[in-house]
């Protein structure tokens, strides 16, 4: 039985290493934020009560490789406000644009990518405090939540509806033009 399982495992590994490679295709710019999170409970450093974990007893650990903490005096509400203000197209979503973890988030990204605009995103699954701050900011219960030019637009259903009616092109038009101007400069 063990021999059978190991043979099957080896055959599977050999097959996967022989699979064809996929060519890279140019895609719109996507900014993926690092959450201020250390786990599901949220990040203690975002509220100012940070604690550092260091390996003091290990003389071989170089300072460059010792763990560090991100310290920030910003509240989650401040982070949400700053994200919205600084990013022309922002999605608070489950996962990231390159690896969405929900069908609705994937749909929103797919629609927005058609307009060749820079998309900024933040994964809300990594931090419940961030997720709750976004919900409180918009008074909207579901994700993804999409902001365009500092305005809350809605979720994937609203973006899809705007796309189908031609409204999204008008809203995103000047963002795409600014990107083209920056690339040609």
Curated annotation (Swiss-Prot):
Gene Ontology CC terms, in alphabetical order: mitochondrial matrix
Pfam families assigned: Glutaredoxin (PF00462)
Main subcellular localisation: mitochondrion
Boundaries of every Glutaredoxin domain copy: 77-179
Protein name (Swiss-Prot/TrEMBL): Monothiol glutaredoxin-S4, mitochondrial
Gene: GRXS4
Species for this entry: Oryza sativa subsp. japonica
Protein purpose: May only reduce GSH-thiol disulfides, but not protein disulfides.
Keyword Hydrolase: no
């Amino acid at each position: 039985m063990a021999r059978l399982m190991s043979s099957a495992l080896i055959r599977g590994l050999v097959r996967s290493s022989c699979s064809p490679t996929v060519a890279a295709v140019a895609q719109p710019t996507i900014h993926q934020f690092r959450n201020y999170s250390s786990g599901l409970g949220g990040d203690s450093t975002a509220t100012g009560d940070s604690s550092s974990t260091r390996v003091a007893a290990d003389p071989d650990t170089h300072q460059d490789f010792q763990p560090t903490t991100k310290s920030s005096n910003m509240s989650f509400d401040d982070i949400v406000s700053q994200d919205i203000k600084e990013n022309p197209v922002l999605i608070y979503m489950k996962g990231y644009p390159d690896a969405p973890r929900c069908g609705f988030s994937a749909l929103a990204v797919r629609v927005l990518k058609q307009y060749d605009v820079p998309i900024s995103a933040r994964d809300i699954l990594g931090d419940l405090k961030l997720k709750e701050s976004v919900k409180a900011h918009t008074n909207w219960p579901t994700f993804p939540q999409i902001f365009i030019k500092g305005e809350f637009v809605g979720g994937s259903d609203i973006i899809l509806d705007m796309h189908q009616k031609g409204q999204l092109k008008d809203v995103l038009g000047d963002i795409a033009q600014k990107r083209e101007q920056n690339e040609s400069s």
